Structure formats: C-alpha cells, structure tokens
C-alpha cells in the first residue's frame, strides 16, 4: 500500500474539494489513461486494487503508471468513545482527486486490451471516470 515515508504533521484538516484539477490532467507517460469525472478521496487500498487489476489483465505486456499518491491522513475515533479528548488517530491514507485528474496511464498494449484493463480498474474506484486515448 502507498503511504508517505514521513510527514511534517501527523494529522490534517479535512478540507474541501472545489473546482477542477489544474495539474495532472494531461497524459504524460503512456498512450491510454483513466480520467476522473467527479471529486473524491481515493484510498491507498483502492489505488492498489486498481493497479493490481490492470497488471493482472495486461499480464506481462504493457507498462502502467499510477499518477496519484495518497498523502492525506484520515483519522478515526475509536467506537463507543465519548466526544472530546482530541482528534482520533490516523487510520489510513487518501489521495484528494478533483475532476479531470488522471489516475492511471498505460502503454505497450493494444487499445482493446487497454480499454478492458482500464474499465476493470475503473470499476474498483468509488467515482465515475472515463477512458482517454493520446491524440497524436
């Protein structure tokens, strides 16, 4: 699972996701990509599940790039705990994703294989997304 080696602070505010993604919204490495259409938090487990699904489907052929990294800690309070006494402890990591952001890129395979692999990865995600092809 992806997570930062070290962070400056253990806990973060939740924040809010306004607007579209202004960075990471163009295909940079591969020929095909999965682009997000709505804002969400994507957990490290979901990123890993999508990556594994794509690599299994493509077998040895093709190369895959993961374009997001979970760098936001999500804290959870223990169950049946009274209110107060501070913020909960960090439980898992998420990547904050806005519309337009590229999640995965792929190359070295045919378009049909890439489309199928990316659709399997898209089904692992909690949000709507679309398949992109690099127009040359």
From Swiss-Prot:
Tell me which Pfam families the record gives. Ribosomal_L16
NCBIfam families named in the record: rplP_bact
**Protein's cellular compartments:** Plastid, Chloroplast
**Is RNA-binding tagged as a keyword?**
no
State the oligomer form and interacting partners: Part of the 50S ribosomal subunit.
By its UniProt entry, which PANTHER family does this protein fall under?
50S/60S RIBOSOMAL PROTEIN L16 (PTHR12220), LARGE RIBOSOMAL SUBUNIT PROTEIN UL16M (PTHR12220:SF13)
GO MF term set? rRNA binding; structural constituent of ribosome
Q: What is this protein called?
A: Large ribosomal subunit protein uL16c
Which cellular component, as a GO term, is one annotated location? mitochondrial large ribosomal subunit
Q: Its family?
A: Belongs to the universal ribosomal protein uL16 family.
Matching entries from SUPFAM superfamilies are given as: Ribosomal protein L16p/L10e (SSF54686)
Q: Where is it chiefly localized?
A: plastid
Stored InterPro entries: Ribosomal_uL16, Ribosomal_uL16_bact-type, Ribosomal_uL16_CS, Ribosomal_uL16_dom, Ribosomal_uL16_sf
Biological process annotations from GO: mitochondrial translation
- Keyword Nuclease in annotation: no
């Amino acid at each position: 699972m992806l997570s930062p080696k070290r962070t400056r602070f253990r806990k973060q505010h939740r924040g809010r996701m306004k607007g579209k993604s202004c960075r990471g919204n163009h295909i940079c490495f591969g020929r095909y990509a999965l682009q997000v259409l709505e804002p969400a938090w994507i957990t490290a487990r979901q990123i890993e599940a999508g990556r594994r699904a794509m690599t299994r489907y493509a077998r040895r052929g093709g190369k895959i790039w993961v374009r997001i990294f979970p760098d936001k800690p999500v804290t959870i309070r223990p169950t049946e705990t009274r209110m107060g006494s501070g913020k909960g402890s960090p439980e898992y990591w998420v990547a904050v994703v806005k519309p337009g952001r590229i999640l995965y890129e792929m190359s070295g395979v045919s378009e049909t294989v890439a489309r199928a692999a990316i659709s399997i990865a898209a089904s692992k995600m909690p949000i709507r997304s679309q398949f992109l092809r690099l127009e040359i």
